[in-house]
Design a protein with these regions (language model features):
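Intrinsic disorder/low-complexity segments
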Residues: 10-14, 18
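Eukaryote-biased recognition of intrinsically disordered, low-complexity regulatory segments
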Residues: 26-46
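Short strand-turn-strand beta-turns centered on an Asx-Gly dipeptide
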Residues: 33, 50, 95-97
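Short, contiguous acidic and Ser/Thr-rich linear segments
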Residues: 45-56
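Ferredoxin-type iron-sulfur electron-transfer modules in oxidoreductases and energy-metabolism complexes
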Residues: 56-75, 122-274
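Glycine-rich phosphate/adenylate-binding loop and adjacent beta-alpha elements
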Residues: 95-119, 124
């Protein structure tokens, strides 16, 4: 079945521009990783889904499949999700070998089925990293990220009461860089894409968005030392600067944050040794 969706765009001249977006239904074959728990060996199982709308999100397609499995008396596929609008970072999975699927700067919940075509075979599996053990099926334990944040990814000094806007002057470039780094949603795509399972982009983003602002300055040195120490303790790998993390980050976090992190860590280490 083929239909058309109307998209209206306004311009400064108040004229309407209309785009016709074709939408259609498709039949797909899914190869999904099923694993009962961390100790289970796990493996792929194949499912056929029919009449999937091109305008469904990837997770909505999973909802349809799970409803069918439940009606058949089978156990539904376990997958993580919450906001379904690209904010929480919960819907983390490989889709055809790519974190979050084929679209760039996009989370799984924002991926629509028009990214695929009728008859496609789609392979879905959980993050593969020592620090992200599988809980069940496509759900992994990402609490290692939480422990890194608990080690120093916050501001604990008393910053006083809320003040008027612009009371603390901040250079525009620093404000822009901090804002861009703060876009990190902690989904773990950077770790999943890295051949070494490094978490430096995640840590770098957190260190940058706090350390660049005046409120985060007092704890700047202890923050980076403690967060790196916890990252190493969790078993994440080293960074070899391949750039795979930036390429797959759904929020486009730049690897310049890793360079900034290395600088911060070196300076903090020198001071701590004195």
């Amino acid at each position: 079945m083929v239909g058309y969706e109307l998209n209206f765009h306004t311009s400064t001249s108040s004229h309407y521009h209309i785009d016709y977006m074709e939408h259609y239904n498709m039949n797909l074959t899914l190869k999904v990783w099923r694993q009962k728990n961390q100790n289970d060996r796990g493996g792929f199982e194949t499912y056929n889904v029919k009449n999937i709308s091109s305008e469904m999100s990837f997770l909505e397609m999973f909802d349809v499949l799970n409803e069918e499995l439940i009606h058949e008396g089978k156990e539904p596929i376990a997958f993580d999700h919450d906001c379904r609008e690209g904010i929480c970072g919960m819907c983390s999975m490989y889709i055809d070998g790519k974190p979050h699927g084929p679209w760039e700067q996009n989370t799984t919940c924002q991926l629509h089925m028009r990214a695929f075509k009728d008859g496609d075979t789609i392979t879905v599996e959980p993050w593969r990293a020592k620090a992200f053990p599988v809980i069940k099926d496509l759900i992994v334990d990402r609490t290692s990220f939480d422990r890194i944040i608990q080690a120093g990814g916050y501001i604990s000094v008393n910053t006083g009461n809320a003040v008027d806007a612009n009371a603390l002057p901040i250079e525009k470039q620093k404000a822009d860089d901090a804002f861009a780094a703060a876009a990190c949603i902690g989904c773990g795509a950077c770790v999943a894409a890295c051949k070494n399972s490094s978490a430096l982009l995640f840590v770098g983003a957190k260190v940058a968005h706090l350390g660049l602002l005046p409120q985060g300055e007092p704890e700047r040195k202890t923050r980076v030392l403690n967060m790196i120490a916890q990252m190493d303790k969790e078993g994440f790998g080293s960074c070899t600067a391949t750039g795979a993390c930036e390429a797959t980050c759904p929020k486009g976090i730049s690897i310049t944050n890793i360079a900034r992190l290395n600088k911060e860590y070196t300076l903090a280490s020198l001071v701590s040794e004195k």
